């Protein structure tokens, strides 16, 4: 009897302990869930504030950083872009670009990146402003600045130009492109000239370069490029053209220098000074005009065929070697 009562007492205590343990486990679980929920809610609240920019933590280095930024902006504050693709440069960067691109263009005139950088870095504001005034004082120049056409293979429709008569400006132009194996799409956009309209004027000059080749018949070999640079410099006044005409011949052979100095330099000076401003020619609107009438109207003489002169020179050289 006593044993039975003892067993019942032990069973009652076990059940009580089990109930207490279950209650304790439930309370712990509920407490953990409540605390976790509070933490998650606080994290979500902070995240929302952070996303909305409503959090303002005090930075111990804020005063120092602000002073440092002010000092840096005083000397190295790069201005904002004035047009798509514009890359503002500090004065010292422009000077470094002039030095580096000048050396690169002299040693490797075939590399376009040096020519492009030298052209833009030396296209100083007074020169471009003078061209701007020249365009604004001419009805066609004003139309170009107002409409801002771009010269590409699409805008010109080269296939249509190939169907024009042989004596037209358009057919002469596309024949020159085909013969030299070049395309108007290779002209890179201007990005280092700060003023937006002056940048377009330089872009226009750059894209018209092949027209100067085509109306004169000069090829893209080094002698032909120098001859066109002389014409450009005397007529338009772009500094890089003058630099190219001055220094590029230094690396040429005596026979090449002789042709330039005796034939193409005098031609470039005369045609460049006597002809009307080439920057004011709206090429896209005169593609069907007669090329000879255009040369006469502009005052541009067609120089001797450079390729024929070179061909004759090498033929004579071969004859002398045989003798």
Curated annotation (Swiss-Prot):
GO terms for biological process: ubiquinone biosynthetic process. It is found in: Mitochondrion inner membrane. Pathway: Cofactor biosynthesis; ubiquinone biosynthesis. Keywords: Lyase, Membrane, Metal-binding, Mitochondrion, Mitochondrion inner membrane, Ubiquinone biosynthesis, Zinc. Component of a multi-subunit COQ enzyme complex, composed of at least COQ3, COQ4, COQ5, COQ6, COQ7 and COQ9. PANTHER family: UBIQUINONE BIOSYNTHESIS PROTEIN (PTHR12922), UBIQUINONE BIOSYNTHESIS PROTEIN COQ4 HOMOLOG, MITOCHONDRIAL (PTHR12922:SF7). Belongs to the COQ4 family. This is Ubiquinone biosynthesis protein COQ4, mitochondrial. It comes from Debaryomyces hansenii (strain ATCC 36239 / CBS 767 / BCRC 21394 / JCM 1990 / NBRC 0083 / IGC 2968).
